[in-house]
Amino acid sequence: MTEHHTPKSRILRFLENQYVYLCTLNDYVQLVLRGSPASSYSNICERLRSDVQTSFSIFLHSTVVGFDSKPDEGVQFSSPKCSQSELIANVVKQMFDESFERRRNLLMKGFSMNHEDFRAMHVNGVQNDLVSTFPNYLISILESKNWQLLLEIIGSDAMHYLLSKGSIFEALPNDNYLQISGIPLFKNNVFEETVSKKRKRTIETSITQNKSARKEVSWNSISISRFSIFYRSSYKKFKQDLYFNLHSICDRNTVHMWLQWIFPRQFGLINAFQVKQLHKVIPLVSQSTVVPKRLLKVYPLIEQTAKRLHRISLSKVYNHYCPYIDTHDDEKILSYSLKPNQVFAFLRSILVRVFPKLIWGNQRIFEIILKDLETFLKLSRYESFSLHYLMSNIKISEIEWLVLGKRSNAKMCLSDFEKRKQIFAEFIYWLYNSFIIPILQSFFYITESSDLRNRTVYFRKDIWKLLCRPFITSMKMEAFEKINENNVRMDTQKTTLPPAVIRLLPKKNTFRLITNLRKRFLIKMGSNKKMLVSTNQTLRPVASILKHLINEESSGIPFNLEVYMKLLTFKKDLLKHRMFGRKKYFVRIDIKSCYDRIKQDLMFRIVKKKLKDPEFVIRKYATIHATSDRATKNFVSEAFSYFDMVPFEKVVQLLSMKTSDTLFVDFVDYWTKSSSEIFKMLKEHLSGHIVKIGNSQYLQKVGIPQGSILSSFLCHFYMEDLIDEYLSFTKKKGSVLLRVVDDFLFITVNKKDAKKFLNLSLRGFEKHNFSTSLEKTVINFENSNGIINNTFFNESKKRMPFFGFSVNMRSLDTLLACPKIDEALFNSTSVELTKHMGKSFFYKILRSSLASFAQVFIDITHNSKFNSCCNIYRLGYSMCMRAQAYLKRMKDIFIPQRMFITDLLNVIGRKIWKKLAEILGYTSRRFLSSAEVKWLFCLGMRDGLKPSFKYHPCFEQLIYQFQSLTDLIKPLRPVLRQVLFLHRRIAD
């Protein structure tokens, strides 16, 4: 940017870091017209009408263009030689003739060369080999009046340079932009790096960096592949001699191979420190037999390690620390699991027996490594573990074998320190990825459970196999049909969907069947092999279309908001028809195993009715949102009926009103799918769903796979058909039926309808093969069948809990549910042990708490002012509960900054203030000020604080902030005094 135009928005700062030279079109015009006074911009603009001049000036100052190098002196004014459309056609054709990198330009989307099915374009009366296969609307933007006028000002040469070398970004409302030319920015790997502190590159530094060696991968982005230890069910004896190549350990070449394996970077081999996303093992290709000088001291230690590993019996150590337990049918499955401390003791014993003490440097470093290993084993299912975290507390100067030569006491220079750190980091990376993880994979079945949420559970593989056998046998008989090998080969050749792999999730005394449809398979096709795309990847177009059909039915209201909108509408209707004062009857039911009981033939008939339109268009675009410290990308796939498709230019205008600091990048070339194609893919997925169990393959006869990307959409259609078939009376005046997946809450002022709904659910829905769970059925009235839940059939209980909130049985006010800091909440949390743990912690707390906080909770047209205030209080209380659960998990690992509470209050204040503005209007007087919102939230956090966290550094500012806000808003309003008086009861 030039000095007189400093970018202020976050998205512009992000763009500035992606290009060597970023400027507005106005700056580019001034650059082109330098030294051309006769054709200056001011002289040309004087001939325009005032309104056109204003519009054109805004266009020049708001449109941004980025270059990989600063435009050279040769970019000067030249009179236009052709029209704008002809110039664009020539630029696109030139891109097809250039390198592959240039071919990814957005302007080329929708064009092809020498296509037989399309008529070629003509430029200046001469046939061009360029043909249009799909309308690229970005071209029409560049052919608009403003761009034609710009061509007259800067000329053909400068316009050609701008279109071919630059990336152009059109300004949208609220500091948003649309990319209309250049290589799509979502292809850049910049989204995990910070964007506000990156130094702006000059042309000279850019050239120097391009000539430098392969760039170092950040240790924060090098993660230990912990996900690979989960769900390894195959029971094979671990052949350590074969895995570690120990048969000829006395051979010098074997030890040399170990050195290459552990320290690949020192031998010039491909490694995780220089190649991102190194998913597979790279074969050792170094032919050099010379050991690098830096590894001469570790050579005898590695040789000693290999010999010890050859002598040790891993099975004996395993049976000692993780003994076999006899299984019994009456006990819970989790009672047979191993404690993480047992697994840790097993691995610690191996490390002590296999590795020499000198390889760790000293006992202090070894204890740090053991502590990190214990943390690694106790992490939950979705928690990550980076190399930066592992290396953060290790003192490199204390490791003797890293010293080059005999000068152990000499002062280290920076380059020597970095080299030592690099070598030991390679060893730590190998220790986890190639030593510890293979042992865990071989001896344990590792999973999460339904009861313990995300907590990692360890089983002996032989015990796991015995526990699973009865359940798998019954599932084979009830839901699956075995197919012979000949049919398998025929089906594999016909289908585009690979077979699915199942896994079992422990659930009290039984299991839940989970189907993995994200896995890719390598199959034999005659003499060749073919890698199949995963089932979920193939079915994404179908998922987009089913989502579109659901949005059409619900008028575009998201799933998570539909329940609240129905409740709001129901209350308004009761008030309108003067039925609000009548007693309200509540029935809550839960469908048993709904996914496993869906009838496939009925499902096909339902979906076929929904696919009314003959053809659908699927549009895909990317959004890049810039925050103060990073940029995140997201891919969106949307489906439309062919005749209802809205141009993307209008779509981004609407999206820009709801967001800020976002860049939109369209894929341009859309997909089209006919209804018959969609139905065929769906039928192939369900009726031809092949599941691999052991070495055999089975066909699923009943239900739909829970791991499918389509499951939630198909379940929605199936449930809606059930409602139309059995529960149409719930749509009468004075009644409402709320549904979240397989949970129903029926509210009515008619007791007969409530009893009818209850009796129907108790009998079951035979046509749809559904029955209800009696222990989860809740009512608030007496019933002749005697099915009464004593907990809720009580006059003192005035609220009905449902899906993260509770409904007042008289006023229908809604209160946000408050989680308790118990084992379930602790097990549901996950932390990322990376460099930016503080930011990750802050955003996790924010997202997890605000995700369930809908506008209805502070809508005073639905809730009373007191209950709206209570919901803000409960938000603070629940956020404090979650924060303490996270801090409990991060104990002795990380302490967030002391300004955590201040930052949280500021963000929450803005978020809730915005929600109030959306409900009551920005011009209306809101019933709470920003300071009062923060005070309520702070009061909730204070009351949610447990004694053990009262003096935690993270909450030091809490009491101070609460007192400051109390002094600021005095005297308190009556509603706030009421909250303060009853605050101890509000969270119950």
Curated annotation (Swiss-Prot):
Name of the molecule in the record: Telomerase reverse transcriptase
Principal location: nucleus
Note: Deletion causes telomere shortening and senescence.
Family: Belongs to the reverse transcriptase family. Telomerase subfamily.
Catalytic reaction equation(s): DNA(n) + a 2'-deoxyribonucleoside 5'-triphosphate = DNA(n+1) + diphosphate
Record domain Reverse transcriptase: where: 486-807
GO CC terms: chromosome, telomeric repeat region; nucleus; telomerase catalytic core complex; telomerase holoenzyme complex; telomere cap complex
Cellular location(s): Nucleus; Chromosome, Telomere
PANTHER family, per the entry: TELOMERASE REVERSE TRANSCRIPTASE (PTHR12066:SF0)
Keywords: Chromosome, DNA-binding, Magnesium, Metal-binding, Nucleotidyltransferase, Nucleus, RNA-directed DNA polymerase, Telomere, Transferase
Source species: Schizosaccharomyces pombe (strain 972 / ATCC 24843)
UniProt: Mg(2+) binding residues: 590, 742-743
Functional note: Telomerase is a ribonucleoprotein enzyme essential for the replication of chromosome termini in most eukaryotes. It elongates telomeres. It is a reverse transcriptase that adds simple sequence repeats to chromosome ends by copying a template sequence within the RNA component of the enzyme.
Quaternary structure note: Catalytic subunit of the telomerase holoenzyme complex composed minimally of trt1 and the telomerase RNA template component. Interacts with est1.
SUPFAM superfamilies registered for this protein in UniProt: DNA/RNA polymerases (SSF56672)
Pfam families with a match to the protein in the record: RVT_1, Telomerase_RBD, TEN_TERT
InterPro entries: DNA/RNA_pol_sf, RT_dom, Telomerase_RBD, Telomerase_RT, TERT_TEN
Keyword Nucleus attributed: yes
GO molecular function, one term: telomerase RNA binding
Any Gene Ontology biological process: DNA strand elongation
